[in-house]
A protein has these predicted regions:
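Conserved catalytic submotifs in the C-terminal HATPase_c
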Residues: 70, 90, 95-105
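Acidic ATP/Mg2+-coordinating residue in the GHKL
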Residues: 151
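Short conserved segment of the HATPase_c
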Residues: 156-169
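Short beta-strand/loop element within the Bergerat-fold HATPase_c
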Residues: 133-143
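Short helix-loop "hinge" at the ATP-lid/N-box region of the Bergerat-fold HATPase_c
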Residues: 124-126
Length: 217
């Protein structure tokens, strides 16, 4: 584990340092210098996101980790989480549909943990699916609330679906390998600790949909 994580941290850090050294030493000037600065900025944010995921995973698997479970209106919470993604969808030129019901849906959950679940699932689409469209819906089904995050990207091969929530697992070459391989593992563990379940369906070249189910109160 540590060997893999060390490699995944050192590689983007080395790249970041390389771009900054080129700017600092004057090897690049003018427009090229500005481009190097922008690339370095993006690499720094990528590295921050990666480290955030690492902290989440280690915290989740530590003996000190506890969830603050309380009764929460999940529809409103979901809308508040997703509204922050709308400017990013526009920036990425990603078509999107968000359909969250107006009626009150009460669930026992940890608000921060649920936010991490939603954010990781959306980020997974942006980082790995190569999708042009994302659809996020919520519905009731047999005393459960279902959150579906669906994209029309490259899909996930059938042989990979059973491993998708495993720690450090990365899919086939059709999907982007960018990332820690921990994001979906964190999602799965977080959902289970809140008494829910998560599943995935996919067809190569057509779609992938993650379905989070949590019991209604």
């Amino acid at each position: 584990l540590m060997t893999s994580l060390s490699h995944d941290v050192r590689t983007p850090l080395t790249t970041l340092i390389g771009y900054l050294d080129a700017v600092h030493s004057g090897i690049v000037i003018g427009q090229e210098r500005e481009e190097y600065i922008e690339i370095a900025r993006r690499r720094a944010y990528d590295l921050k996101d990666y480290i955030d995921v690492l902290f989440d995973w280690f915290r989740l698997n530590s003996d000190e980790f506890t969830l603050s479970i309380e009764s929460v209106e999940i529809a409103e919470l979901s809308r508040n989480i997703l509204k922050d993604w709308i400017p990013i969808f526009h920036e990425k030129k990603l078509d999107f549909e968000i359909d969250i019901p107006e009626n009150r849906l009460m669930v026992n959950l940890d608000s921060d943990g649920y936010s991490r679940v939603v954010n990781n699932l959306v980020q997974n689409v942006l980082a790995h699916s190569k999708a042009r469209r994302i659809k996020i819906t919520m519905s009731e089904d047999s005393k459960m609330v279902l959150l579906r995050v669906e994209d029309n990207g490259v899909g996930i091969a059938k042989e990979n679906l059973q491993h998708i929530f495993e720690r450090l697992y990365k899919c086939d070459k059709g999907r982007s390998k960018k990332g820690s391989g921990l994001g979906l593992s964190i999602v799965s563990q977080m959902v289970e600790r809140m008494g829910g379940k998560i599943s995935v369906e996919s067809e190569i070249g057509k779609y992938t949909v993650f379905i989070v189910s949590l019991p209604l109160i």
